[in-house]
Amino acid sequence: MPTVATSSNRETVDKYWLAVNARDWDSLAKLLDPDYVWEMPQSGERVRGEQSNREMNDNYPAGLPDIETHRITGSEDRWVTTPSWTVLKITGTGDDYVSESRVSYPDGSVWHAVDMFHFRDGKIRSQVAYFAPTLEAAEWRARWVERF
């Protein structure tokens, strides 16, 4: 089995987010293992393979989120706007990396996303993504916590 330098996997995560933002599915495909799997446990969904991933992203209702373009699509009774997606931090070592992101929707809601990447032979073998809205802090903890 080939050995992959840690920095190469980190660079691949950077390239992943750049390719997603650019909608460059050909470049993204080069980063994915042939057995790529993307899981979203909160909704109980699994995407198998690069082609399914490509087709799903091509059919995102308002286009994929980014920080440059905000498209609005919809019909008379349903409108979908594209959120802004900001990668805040990427950490990891070896074959496991995690990215933390902040997603801001046009309605003012803010969500947080965590994507866990696992590598095999320098390619992204699997990805697990968690999404959660911002929550109000519980009052009972106020005297022990610091708000940020």
Task: Give a label for each model feature.
Residues 1-148:
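C-terminal and inter-domain tail/linker signature
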